[in-house]
Amino acid sequence: MIYGGVGVDTVYPDSIYIGKGVRITAGTKILTHYLDPSQPGVHFLRGEVHIEDDVFIGLNVCICSSVTIGKGAIIGAGSVVTKDIPPYQVWAGNPARYIKDRAK
């Protein structure tokens, strides 16, 4: 279920994969491209976002491109996800960091 106010990158929306039983709450942003600092001017790089089954994403989370959020993971409110999250773990913060494992 995707709640109101979720922002999905409109440049490459086909690069976002969302599994079954996923809950994405209001204010979350999902990004599929980023500015390439090694290039002059404005040059974007594309990356996919994979959100596996039974993930819960709290309020106002930013999910950066080129990440996978593993099955059953929980992402705390206000987090910025910049790297892969393993299955059945709780992560939170800016940048998001490991908090603890959760029951499977």
Question: Model-predicted segments: where are they?
Answer:
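Flexible, glycine/small-residue-enriched loop-and-beta-strand segment within the central core
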Residues: 2-68, 94-95, 100-103
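Beta-rich strand-turn-strand
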Residues: 59-83
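Hydrophobic alpha-helix-in-membranes signature
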Residues: 85-86, 94
